[in-house]
Amino acid sequence: MAKISIIIPVYNVEKYLQQCIDSLLSQTLSDIEIICIDDASQDASGKILNDYAARDDRMKVIHADENMGTLRARIKGITDAAGQYVMFVDSDDYLEVSACEELLKLLTEHPVDVLHFGTVLHANENVSDDLKNWVTNFITP
C-alpha cells in the first residue's frame, strides 16, 4: 500500500500538466500513487497522462466519458485510492521535491485528520489582482 495517494482532476490543462506530473514523480518519497482523473479533456491531456502511466507504474489514469467537474473527479479518485493518506493536487500545481516526505513526517509526528500546507501563487498574466489577493488572504492565518 502506498503511503500517499495523490489525486489530480485533469481537464484541458496540457500546458501545465507535465510540470505537475514531473514534480510528483520526482518526489523524495517514492511510496506514492498518483491517480489522475481525465475529466473528458478535449486537448492532449489524456494522451500526456497515458504516456506517463506507460512509463511509471505509480501512475493510474481514469478517463471519464463525460465531464463531471472537479468535485466528482476527486470523489472518483478517492474511491480508487489505496494509500494510507489522500492528497489533492490541482493539475496546474507543482510541488517541491521533498513535499510528500515532509508532509508524511508531519502527519506521523502530529496525528491530525486534515493537514493544509503553505501555498505560493505563481500567477500568469490572466490572473487579476483581486484573485491574487483572495488567494493570499485565504492561505494566510
Name each model feature, range by range.
Residues 1-141:
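Nucleotide-sugar donor-binding/catalytic module of glycosyltransferases
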